[in-house]
Amino acid sequence: DWIQQFEQEGIKNTLILQKEIENLKRDVRGITSLFKLSKKITRSEFKTYAASLLDKNHFIRSFQWIPRIKQSERSALESQAQKEGLVNFHFTILSEESTFITAPNKREYFPIQYIEPFFGNDSLLGFDISSQPTLLNLVNRARDSGKIVAANTKDLFNQDPNRMLTLFFSPLYKGGETPKTTEARKRLFMGVAVGTYQLNDMIRQVIEPYLIPGIFL
């Protein structure tokens, strides 16, 4: 029966899922490598590279580049984005009513500078993810470890509050290489590439071939 068949395929399914997760980590690491190769990646270059990854799987929600920005650098980055045609670009946070409001001044920010797909996600540009404790914790874990970190979270922007998202954070450091000490990693940290995925869709893609008609996940 289908249960026995599914049990027999359990190890195979696990290996497939592990391989897919490694592919996701490789993709977000590739975004980081893009910024290693050049000190300045344009919005168009980011779009072209991300598009090649987005075409591969429907469960990829988005790719983002999120730089570490000091207070003294805020105005320049906002002006740069506005000159690129994003006339309403400015650093934002979520209000208690879950609407975007201007981010207050502080020592440093982690704004979403680039995001693909652009359409449908453009309202997230400029959002300071460090204003959300869960996301700031992921940034700090990636920064301090020098490795990709991942976590499941609800959609913070109410696009689909019932769907869990999986976020992969890949850190980037000045000089391109990962510093050997935590202190150096904190000092040379430049930002993170982020991949947002719907892993439940990926799991469904693996499991559905073994379900008999009328059985739904």
Label each PLM-derived region with a short phrase.
Residues W2-V28, F35-R43:
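Membrane-proximal amphipathic alpha-helices
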